[in-house]
């Protein structure tokens, strides 16, 4: 941000306040895109900062929406349903029915559990509406479903008349500073997707992968070589057996660098060696 504009804001706006530099944000998105292979497309996790959604709409293919509240925000902003990934561990009947009633059903719904599968199967049957879904594969934590559950769903996929199963979602956490951890996860998911094709004849159209890129917050972390880190991950993606559509879900990694928080000192004192 230009210093003159910064000074103007400080003089005219009461602290505390946030400023989001949209030029910096757009450059960040362009940079991340340039570092990834062509089959990788970005999905912005709205929870990271919902205020910038409309500003980046032309540059982002998908939005991850993990609550009914976020969906209402996206709806008010005029976000196309075709760009929505309806995620989240909690999906209740009232909110899911409202979402199904409001759009043309071009969204993608994630399935975190067998209960969520049965809920959406029930609602779509009643409404005779076909929706797209992806199945979340657990990383071993409380989120998603185990391999056996996903395999069972796919073995019986013909009975889900109104659920178009497009693929797999995988996300294990965030702030992963070692590229080898993400590479290991990509290898695991790649092998699982290949097994689904070979053993069940199920071809994944959509792989949604949350890498959990780290955000540098403190001075001691400034030596993090992000370019090399991203190149190593991109190289792994290029050499995967799966070469279909990959949606890379990112939140803080996209938006963190564009924000500044302004406040003021209201008191000053010294205790021993600390101010």
Feature names for model-found ranges:
Residues 3-16:
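Generic N-terminal amphipathic, Lys/Arg-enriched alpha-helix
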Residues 9-11, 167-174, 210-215:
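A short small-residue
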Residues 13-22, 42-44:
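A glycine-/small-polar-enriched, mobile loop at the entrance of the PLP active site in fold-type I
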Residues 28-36:
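A short, N-terminal amphipathic alpha-helix
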Residues 40-206, 236, 266-269:
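Active-site-proximal beta-alpha core segment in soluble small-molecule metabolic enzymes
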Residues 184-275:
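C-terminal active-site-proximal or functional interface alpha/beta core segments in diverse enzymes
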